Amino acid sequence: LHQHGVIHRDITPANIILARDGAHLIDFGIARIWSASSNRSRDTTALGTYGFASPEQYGFAKTDARSDVFSLGRLLGFMLTGVYPDASDYEQRLADDAAVPARLRAVIGYACAFEPSKRPQSVQEFRQALFSQSNPPMPNASSANPPSTRTTNGSASASRLFRRLHLSKRAIVLWSIAGAALIIAA
């Protein structure tokens, strides 16, 4: 998508469908064409789904691939917690070591840094941080989702996690496959 100059600007669970050949991103209604040589200094309309849209989408700043990286970070947080990012208990669930291992929380914090320059600069860089064995760079205090300072002694068992999220195993697997497919396909 980005290699073709398209910025989606509305990556949410509702805009992902699963098909036999994998996960697909749909609803390009607010997508825009972007290029490095574009003379557009800012977007003029606040668009995107609240909770998933990047801060620059609401601050009338220029959006680019890093805006979609922010949304992917929020999508990952949703997949791990089962709670939408605009819910009152999202941050609490995200900070729960039993639900979200510290390393994944750090990846989410990195992707969701308030300043675009502090985020992965591309979906490929986000994918590398997600699948790397080392910890991603830690965002500074201006991140949208500061990672918890608590440590973890390992991730919870799958059955305990499913019970905590009140989601079926099928739903967890489908969301995980969809998210991973989108990240890998990018």
Describe every region a protein language model picked out.
Residues R119:
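Conserved HRD-motif arginine in the catalytic loop of eukaryotic-like protein kinases
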Residues L1-V6:
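Protein kinase catalytic-loop region centered on the HRD/HxD motif
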Residues D68:
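Conserved catalytic-loop aspartate of Hanks-type protein kinases
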Residues N15-I26:
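Conserved protein kinase catalytic/activation segment
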Residues S41-E56:
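Conserved activation segment of eukaryotic-like protein kinases, specifically the C-terminal portion
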Residues A99-F114:
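Conserved C-terminal C-lobe helix
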